[in-house]
């Protein structure tokens, strides 16, 4: 008499476990994927923004790769999800995914190396994480980022024309030359997105993930004929002016 096997059958080339494959099929593969937005500024436009990009080593972040496979990003996020048992076993989150048989490290340290971020900003006065948690300085944020003479309201709205509080603090820190560790922000956001995969939301940082996969040796040729992620509208001087974000005031 034939006996039934208790071993789950799954595609172990594409997925870490049967659990990850199931989440991919049920939820992840239907998620919208977005890329980082490219900065497209001429040499005489917003020099303070271009200066901050160069100072922080964010050139690769500000000029994202295009023509990225949506399936690649879906598989990356599906395999970044871990169970509660795995979290307890390893004492926290794992900064590791798996794409087409290849482990992909998305730890802050590896993101900084692959993206060529500078380790810190010379002469930085404070840190974004400290500001976010303990010293938001919202009066300064409003005074220096918002247009004079307008009435402003802090909200948690998610409209594209609105800036959430945390993002406003991030922009303020960047423009003031304070320490912003982009690698930690990206790694943390990937973790939170993966662990909250059943919630509404989009899958981001596709260009960074593509570069991590390429560095790890993922066979990207296998994704050549798959559907690509739409390119985001670049940030231009005209777009900055239309959103009424002023330049950083001089002191």
Task: Show where each model-derived region lies.
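A structural signal for long, well-ordered, hydrophobic/aromatic- and basic-residue-enriched core segments
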Residues: 1-251
């Amino acid at each position: 008499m034939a006996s039934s096997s208790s071993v789950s059958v799954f595609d172990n080339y594409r997925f870490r476990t049967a659990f990850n494959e199931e989440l991919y099929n049920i939820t992840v593969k239907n998620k919208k994927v977005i890329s980082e937005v490219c900065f497209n500024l001429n040499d005489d436009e917003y020099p303070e923004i271009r200066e901050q990009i160069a100072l922080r080593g964010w050139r690769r972040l500000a000029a994202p790769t295009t023509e990225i496979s949506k399936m690649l990003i879906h598989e990356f996020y599906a395999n970044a999800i871990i169970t509660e048992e795995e979290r307890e076993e390893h004492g926290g989150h794992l900064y590791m995914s798996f794409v087409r048989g290849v482990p992909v490290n998305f730890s802050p340290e590896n993101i900084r190396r692959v993206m060529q971020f500078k380790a810190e900003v010379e002469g930085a006065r404070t840190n974004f994480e400290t500001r976010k948690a303990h010293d938001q300085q919202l009066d300064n944020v409003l005074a220096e980022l918002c247009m004079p003479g307008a009435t402003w309201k802090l909200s948690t709205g998610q409209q594209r024309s609105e800036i959430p509080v945390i993002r406003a603090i991030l922009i303020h820190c960047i423009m003031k030359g304070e320490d912003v560790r982009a690698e930690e922000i990206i790694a943390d956001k990937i973790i939170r997105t993966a662990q909250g995969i059943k919630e509404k939301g989009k899958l981001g940082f596709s260009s960074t993930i593509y570069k991590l996969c390429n560095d790890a040796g993922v066979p990207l040729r296998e994704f050549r004929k798959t559907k690509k992620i739409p390119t985001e509208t670049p940030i231009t001087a005209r777009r900055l002016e239309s959103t009424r974000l002023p330049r950083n005031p001089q002191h």
